A protein has these predicted regions:
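Active-site neighborhood of HAD-like aspartate-dependent phosphohydrolases
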Residues: 1-61, 79-82, 89
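A metal-dependent, Asp-based hydrolase signature
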Residues: 55-186
Length: 186
């Protein structure tokens, strides 16, 4: 017996909706008290179409960041959301070299995420726009870099900029990725 598996998320939802959901996931992960809870904006269960479009524009830089990821062979929305999060921490670390000093990042449980979120909020961490993430990504990742090397380069840059703060948390299917995946499934 042979088994055939079809990936139909994009077919059923449309690619547009799938990327809308990715923006919503980032919004929830950064702002909801179930996750980091660092934003002042409350997460609502049924945002308007205008809000969804605004979030997508904000996080994905009018889709330029999504297109850039896809050119590198990154097609999974879970992976794209992970890359955004890693790059957002790196943008923040470049803006304030002491931001992560003394912190211990733990993405493995909701209480640990909230603790990290509280510490980041106290240190005035601000989620960067998709444009800032795109600018950083373009400086880190050469145009001809393939998928696996993209993750290596971005994770290495964050590890270097934040010392051991994110040790053991990065990488595909690491605890940061799993936390974002859980938010996606929420």
């Amino acid at each position: 017996m042979k088994t055939v598996i079809f990936d139909v998320d994009g077919v059923l939802l449309s690619e547009k909706r799938y990327f809308d959901v990715s923006g919503l996931v980032l919004w929830e992960w950064y702002n909801s008290p179930l996750f980091l809870g660092i934003g002042e904006e409350p997460v609502i269960a049924e945002p308007t179409e205008e809000k969804i479009e605004a979030l997508r524009r904000h996080y994905w830089a009018d889709d330029e960041l999504l297109r850039r990821f896809k050119r590198h062979g990154i097609n999974s929305n879970w992976d794209m959301v992970y890359l955004f999060a890693v790059c957002s921490f790196l943008v923040a670390a470049q803006g304030d070299a002491n931001l992560f000093r003394g912190l211990s990042a733990d993405f493995s449980t909701s209480p640990a995420l909230r603790k990290l979120g509280t510490a980041l909020r106290r240190r005035a961490f601000a989620v960067p726009s998709g444009r800032r993430v795109l600018d950083l990504f373009e400086t880190l990742v050469p145009e001809d870099t393939k998928k696996d090397d993209v993750f290596f380069l971005v994770d290495k840059a964050l590890s270097g900029a934040t010392a051991a703060v994110f040790a053991g948390q990065l990488g595909l299917h690491g605890t940061l990725w799993q936390s974002l995946f859980a938010c996606f499934q929420n």
